[in-house]
Amino acid sequence: MGSIIDAAAAADPVVLMETAFRKAVKSRQIPGAVIMARDCSGNLNYTRCFGARTVRRDECNQLPPLQVDTPCRLASATKLLTTIMALQCMERGLVDLDETVDRLLPDLSAMPVLEGFDDAGNARLRERRGKITLRHLLTHTSGLSYVFLHPLLREYMAQGHLQSAEKFGIQSRLAPPAVNDPGAEWIYGANLDWAGKLVERATGLDLEQYLQENICAPLGITDMTFKLQQRPDMLARRADQTHRNSADGRLRYDDSVYFRADGEECFGGQGVFSGPGSYMKVLHSLLKRDGLLLQPQTVDLMFQPALEPRLEEQMNQHMDASPHINYGGPMPMVLRRSFGLGGIIALEDLDGENWRRKGSLTFGGGPNIVWQIDPKAGLCTLAFFQLEPWNDPVCRDLTRTFEHAIYAQYQQG
C-alpha cells in the first residue's frame, strides 16, 4: 500500500489521493470506496466513487459500480443515528441523560454482573452495584460488553448460556450479563442496542418508524432503513460485503447473515443500511448545527468529553493496548482521547492544522466505514468501504490519505 501512496510526493494532494484509490481498485486491494467531504459554508462539497459494490460479476460479466446512493451496511456507524434519536427523546422531555433507566428498561436494570467462574466452572453472578443511566449507555460506561470482545462472556457462551448471534434476534444480543458496574470502566458493548430499546419504549414507536420520521424525513433521506428485506428497491442495488483473506490478502464474497435476513427487531447498535450520501447528510447537519435533527446546544453537548478523568485514562489505556481493534481507525494510537455522546473525541490536534483538530468527533463501522466531524476546522468527512474485517490496513491507509488531502486542499482555500 505504501508504494501506491508514496509514488509521487509533490503533486496536488487530492490528485495523488484519487490516484491511490484508483490503483487500489485496479490492483484488487479493495473492491470499491466512496469518499465525501463537506464544510460549513457550502464551499466544499466533495464526492468521489471508486470501483465496484461487489466482487461478484453480474449476468453481463460486469462488476456493478459502487455509487453514492448504493445501499450499504453501516454496522456500528448505526450508533451515531441511535445516539441522535436518544438525544431527541431527551430534548422532548421523554428521558433524561442522568436518570436511571429502570422505568423504561427494567429488564436491563435486573441484569446481573458476571464476575467469573468458580473452580467447578460455574458462572458467578451478582447483583449490579449502582444504576444505569442513558449517559452510561451513550458513552459505553454501563458495564456491558460484546461477547466477541470479553473473555468472560466468551466462556459464558461456550458453556451454552447464550444463543448464537446468528439467530439474529435482538434478545440474543441483549441477553449477555454485564461484566462490571455502571461507571466502573469504559467497555465497548451493546449499549446502543439498549438505547434503541429505550427510544422505542419512550416513544411507543419501533426504531424503524422513529428513524423514518425523525431522521430521514427532516433531511429528505429515502434510502436509510433497518428493514432492508422490506425494501426491494434497495435490495436490487445494495453492496455486498467483501472479506479479505488473512492468509493471502485476496478478496472474497462474504455471504453475511446481515444481508439475508432482517433482525427480529431493530438493532440500534448496528442494524441500519444506507447510501453513503444519505449518511453524509446526517454528518453535515450536525456540523452546521442547523436544528433539523438536534438543537444546536444538544449538538454542542455531543462534542463535550463525557468521561471523568479516571474513566478517560482507563479508556486510553484500553485503546492503546488494543491496536488489533483500533477503535479510532486512522487516528494515531498515541493520541489523547475521550468519549462524547456519539463517538471518540480528540483531545489534541492530530497534526496541527493539517488534519483533524482538537475537539473533533469520530467513529465508524465494521466494513471500514470512518466518519468524523471537526467543528474547529469546519469540516466533516466520510470514508465508506464494504470490506471486512475492521481495521483493514489498506482501507485505513487510504482513509488517512483521503483526509490529509482534503485538509490540505481546504487549507489552501
UniProtKB/Swiss-Prot annotation:
Organism expressing this protein natively: Aspergillus terreus
Consequence of substituting S256T: Strongly increases simvastatin synthase activity upon overexpression in E.coli and abolishes activity with LovD-bound alpha-methylbutanoate
Effect of N191G: Strongly increases simvastatin synthase activity upon overexpression in E.coli and abolishes activity with LovD-bound alpha-methylbutanoate
Keywords: Acyltransferase, Hydrolase, Transferase
Disruption of the gene: reported phenotype: Loss of lovastatin biosynthesis.
Result after altering H161Y: Strongly increases simvastatin synthase activity upon overexpression in E.coli
Active site: S76 (acyl-ester intermediate)
Recorded consequence of changing L361M: Strongly increases simvastatin synthase activity upon overexpression in E.coli and abolishes activity with LovD-bound alpha-methylbutanoate
Thylakoid found in the keyword field: no
Any further remark recorded for this protein: Directed evolution toward higher catalytic activity with free diketides led to an enzyme with 1000-fold higher activity in simvastatin synthesis, due to numerous mutations that affect protein folding and promote optimal alignment of the residues that are important for substrate binding and catalysis.
Example of a GO MF term: polyketide synthase activity
Mutagenesis / variant outcome for changing M157V: Strongly increases simvastatin synthase activity upon overexpression in E.coli and abolishes activity with LovD-bound alpha-methylbutanoate
Catalyses which reaction(s): monacolin J carboxylate + (S)-2-methylbutanoyl-[2-methylbutanoate polyketide synthase] = lovastatin carboxylate + holo-[2-methylbutanoate polyketide synthase]
Protein name (Swiss-Prot/TrEMBL): Monacolin J acid methylbutanoyltransferase
Outcome, altering H404K: Strongly increases simvastatin synthase activity upon overexpression in E.coli and abolishes activity with LovD-bound alpha-methylbutanoate
PANTHER family xref list: (LOVD), PUTATIVE (AFU_ORTHOLOGUE AFUA_5G00920)-RELATED, BETA-LACTAMASE-RELATED
Outcome of mutating A178L: Strongly increases simvastatin synthase activity upon overexpression in E.coli and abolishes activity with LovD-bound alpha-methylbutanoate
SUPFAM superfamilies: beta-lactamase/transpeptidase-like
Effect of G275S: Strongly increases simvastatin synthase activity upon overexpression in E.coli and abolishes activity with LovD-bound alpha-methylbutanoate
UniProt enzyme class: transferase
Application of this enzyme or protein: Lovastatin acts as a hypolipidemic agent that works as inhibitor of (3S)-hydroxymethylglutaryl-coenzyme A (HMG-CoA) reductase (HMGR) which reduces HMG-CoA to mevalonate and is the key step in cholesterol biosynthesis. Lovastatin, simvastatin and related compounds are widely used to treat hypercholesteremia and reduce the risk of cardiovascular disease. Furthermore, statins such as lovastatin were found to be anticancer agents.
Quaternary structure and partners: Interacts with LovF.
Reported impact of A9V: Strongly increases simvastatin synthase activity upon overexpression in E.coli and abolishes activity with LovD-bound alpha-methylbutanoate
Effect recorded for L192I: Strongly increases simvastatin synthase activity upon overexpression in E.coli and abolishes activity with LovD-bound alpha-methylbutanoate
Enzyme Commission number: 2.3.1.238
